[in-house]
Every structure is written in C-alpha cells, then in structure tokens.
Amino acid sequence: MVALVLVAGVLVAQNPQVNAQYGVPYAYAHYPGQDKAVNLCFDFYEPADSSDALRPLVITVFGGGFVFGSRDYEDMVEWCTRFAEIGCAAASIDYRLLPAKKFSSKELVRTGYMAAQDVSTAVRFFKANSEKYRIDTNRIFLLGQSAGAVAIIHALYMDEDERPSETRAYPELPPLHSQGNAEEKAQSFGVAGAILLWGCVFDPEMIDADEITPVCLIHGEKDRILPVDSGYAFSIMGMPYAYGSRVMANRLKELGTVPFELHLKENEAHAFYFKHLSMFQLDAIKFDECFQIARDFMLRNEKE
C-alpha cells in the first residue's frame, strides 16, 4: 500500500520500504550584497529496514536553470526513493537560486557559483555527520540534472583561480569549498562519482589532468537548452556559453586520467525523462533507463 503525504504543497507517495525526513537544515548561506542568510535544507531517504551498517549516499541536485526548482520535484523524489529501495541513503538538497527580477548572464554565472558552493557544503555536511546518518564517506555520489548537473560540474572542476570574475567582489561569496562550520570546513569535498544529466561546463579547460572523480554523462543530442556540444545556454545569444557532455567527454578522453561514461540519446531533447518539461511529469520508461545507467555506474565505481 502506498500512502500520499503533502510535502511543500506537493503530493508525494510514501513507500513502506523507505523512511523519509523532510526539511532538515544543512547550511545558512548569503546572497551577494545581503546580510540576511537563507536556510538551506534537504530531504533524507533511507531503507525502512536499514541496519546499523554504513550505506552509500546519493546527493541529488534539482534542475531549473538556476531560476526555479525544488528539492521535492517529482524526479528528485523518484531518484531518492529508488536509491533507498536498493539499500542506499539519499538526500535531495536545496541550493540558492537566482534572486527575483535579476535574470542576466552575469547573475546566472554568479548563481551557478553559489549553487556549486552549496553542493560542496552539502557533501562536507554529510561527511561531518556521517555517523548520525550512517554514511560510508568513501561511497558518496552526486547526481544532478540540468542546472543541478552544472552546479556539480563546477564544484568538481573549478579551482580558486578559475572562479568567475562576477563572484570576486562579494565577501559573501568566499572560496568554493570554504562554507560551513569548523567541522565541515575540515572535510574534503571528494566524492566517489558523479552522475551528470544534460549538464555543461562554462570552460572545458577547468577539467585538469589531476581530476580523480569518475563521471557518468547522460545527454540528449537534440538538446537546445544546454547543447550536447557547445553553444549559448538556452540558445540565447548573450547568455553564458556552454560546453556540453560530448565536449566534456572529449576533454576527459584527451587527459586520460579519469574514468568516464558518455551516454548520448539520439533524437532526445533537454531533460528527456520528463513527458512535458513545463509540467515536470516523468516518463517512466525513460526515467528507468536513466536509473539503470546511474545504478550500474555506481556499482562500477564504489570504493570499499
């Protein structure tokens, strides 16, 4: 029997195999030029019959162009539920979004940097609290779609000297991996792997020979929001120039130092596991295909 519960205005199916906690705070973070911090939370999913054994953790990061989105979107709930069903812990996180009425190329870049900061903070939060959540810190994976994938990519690859100039004038935007309390700041950001669905990097030269994180890239070849090759984000001139999954894969292949997988889907557009992108309704068959790819990637890259 599956029950329904209202979470943040959305009806969410409750699975008897999965326990969930909603709205758990993990960080307080600032917007540029504002003194007031915002509360960032996560929803946590785990197997209902979980033992005291340490589990892998998957941290999921929603999409929405850095303009909108929520940790309780249908795909995030489904990812986390499915991972909990196979014995993992999973957490769907908040991150800072673009302030209202400030849509521009510079603001998107700045917001992308803040989102990358928040991804890093979430990873280090769970490392610092691994005993409480029974997490195997050697088996933490990241999964993001669209803007969520972009945030993960830049958290993985951006060095301090590569951060955008748009972020440097604000004391509220410290170095990428420096947010959090003292215990969290003492943790490294490193993860076991990242599953990146229809994401991009703003400069492929950020991907260096010293990268060590395995990545799984999934992308539709007809994507016009974040192209699989390269082009302006949203296909709008003046927006940030984006280098998609095929460019990133070619860069990783050229370097030859990081395990990676590239899964291209012919005739598929952006966020193709949704039936209708504007309504965020999942296509069960396409989502299941992505889940199988992600699960198999994790099994191949688990660190004991």
Residue ranges and their predicted role:
Residues 72-92:
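Short amphipathic alpha-helix adjacent to the substrate-entry channel of hydrolases
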Residues 242, 246-304:
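C-terminal catalytic histidine-bearing segment of alpha/beta-hydrolase fold enzymes
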Residues 171-255:
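The feature captures the conserved acid-bearing segment of alpha/beta-hydrolase catalytic domains
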Residues 53-65:
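Short beta-strand element of the alpha/beta-hydrolase
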Residues 66-75, 94-113, 158-159, 268-278:
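Cap/lid segment of the alpha/beta-hydrolase catalytic domain
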Residues 14-53:
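N-terminal cap/lid segment of alpha/beta-hydrolase-fold proteins
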Residues 133-144:
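Alpha/beta-hydrolase fold nucleophile elbow
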Residues 108-131, 154:
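Alpha/beta-hydrolase active-site loop
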